[in-house]
C-alpha cells in the first residue's frame, strides 16, 4: 500500500493583527487527506513536535463549510481519528513513506524551515523515488532542505509555486512577516535556487509539477495539488 506522510505545523501562536492565532489551515490538511484516503492510500499525520493547533481564520464559514465542516465536526471521521494518532516526526521511520505532503497555514513559516525530522522524511522519500509536495505556505519546508546525495537544495533548478506575495499583502501580514524575518514562498524559492511560478491571481486554483516535486498556491488548490501528487507518483 502507498503510504503518505501528511505534515502539519506545530506552531500555534498569535500572528494576525486582529490577535488571532495561526497554525494548521484546516482544508489544506483535510482536502489532501480526503483525496489520498479515497485513493486508498495509507496516511500518517505528523508534526515536528507531535502537537498542532488550528489557524483561527481557517475555521470560519468562508473557509470551512458544507461537507468539509461535517467531516471536521464528526469526532469519528477518519480525518479526526487520524489527528488523534498524530505522531512526532522523530518517532517515525522515514523509509516507510512513498509521498511527503506539507500542509500549510502561516504557522509553517515558523517551524518548517528548521523542522529537521520532517525534512529528513521528505529527503528520504525523494531519495527513494517518491514524491515531495506541499501547498500554500507548505513549501516553507524547502527552506534549508538539502538533497543528502548532492548537498544542494532539493528544489535547486526546479519550478515551484506557493502562496503569493500579493496574497500576503491582501491579508495584511507582509509587515508582520518582515518583522519576524519570515520569508515568503517566492523568497524561499529564490533562496534555494528554484524558479517561482506565479498564478494569474492569488486565489486561482493553480499547481506546478516538476518531476517529483509538486506544489500548489493556496487553499483553493489543495485538492488539485493532491491529485497531481497521485499523477506524479503513478507516472514515476
UniProtKB/Swiss-Prot annotation:
The modification Cysteine sulfinic acid (-SO2H) is found at residue 136. The keyword Hydrolase does not apply. Disulfide bonds: none annotated. One of its GO terms (molecular function) is glyoxalase III activity. InterPro entries: Class_I_gatase-like (IPR029062), DJ-1/PfpI (IPR002818), Prot/Nucl_acid_deglycase (IPR050325). GO terms for cellular component: cytoplasm; fungal biofilm matrix; hyphal cell wall; yeast-form cell wall. GO terms for biological process: methylglyoxal catabolic process to D-lactate via S-lactoyl-glutathione. Disruption phenotype: Has a 3- to 5-fold increase in levels of intracellular methylglyoxal compared with wild-type cells grown in the same media. Gene3D superfamilies: 3.40.50.880. It comes from the Eukaryota. Coiled coil: none annotated. The active site is at residues 136-137, 168. Keywords: Lyase, Oxidation, Stress response. It catalyses: methylglyoxal + H2O = (R)-lactate + H(+). Its EC number is 4.2.1.130. Transmembrane segments: none annotated. The keyword GTP-binding does not apply. Catalyzes the conversion of methylglyoxal (MG) to D-lactate in a single glutathione (GSH)-independent step. Selective for MG, does not use glyoxal as substrate. Plays a role in detoxifying endogenously produced MG, particularly when glycerol is the principal carbon source. Important for viability in stationary phase. Monomer. Belongs to the peptidase C56 family. HSP31-like subfamily. This is Glyoxalase 3. The lineage of its organism: Eukaryota, Fungi, Dikarya, Ascomycota, Saccharomycotina. The gene is GLX3.
Amino acid at each position: 500500500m502507498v503510504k503518505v506522510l501528511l505534515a502539519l505545523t506545530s506552531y500555534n501562536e498569535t500572528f494576525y493583527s486582529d490577535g488571532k492565532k495561526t497554525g494548521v489551515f484546516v482544508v489544506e490538511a483535510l482536502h489532501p487527506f480526503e483525496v489520498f484516503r479515497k485513493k486508498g492510500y495509507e496516511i500518517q499525520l505528523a508534526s515536528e513536535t507531535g502537537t498542532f493547533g488550528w489557524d483561527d481564520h481557517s475555521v470560519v464559514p468562508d473557509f470551512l463549510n458544507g461537507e468539509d465542516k461535517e467531516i471536521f465536526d464528526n469526532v469519528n471521521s477518519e480525518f479526526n481519528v487520524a489527528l488523534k494518532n498524530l505522531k512526532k516526526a522523530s518517532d517515525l521511520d522515514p523509509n516507510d513513506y512513498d509521498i511527503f505532503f506539507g500542509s500549510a497555514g502561516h504557522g509553517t513559516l515558523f517551524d518548517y524551515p528548521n523542522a529537521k525530522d520532517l525534512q529528513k522524511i521528505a529527503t528520504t522519500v525523494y531519495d527513494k523515488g517518491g514524491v515531495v509536495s506541499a501547498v500554500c505556505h507548505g513549501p516553507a519546508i524547502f527552506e534549508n532542505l538539502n538533497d543528502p546525495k548532492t548537498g544542494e537544495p532539493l528544489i535547486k533548478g526546479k519550478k515551484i509555486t506557493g502562496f503569493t506575495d500579493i496574497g500576503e499583502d491582501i491579508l495584511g501580514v507582509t509587515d508582520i512577516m518582515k518583522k519576524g524575518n519570515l520569508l515568503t514562498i517566492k523568497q524561499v524559492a529564490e533562496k534555494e535556487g528554484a524558479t517561482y511560478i506565479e498564478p494569474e491571481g492569488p486565489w486561482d486554483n493553480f499547481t506546478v509539477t516538476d518531476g517529483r516535486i509538486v506544489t500548489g498556491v493556496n487553499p483553493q488548490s489543495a485538492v488539485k495539488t493532491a491529485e497531481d501528487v497521485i499523477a506524479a507518483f503513478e507516472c514515476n
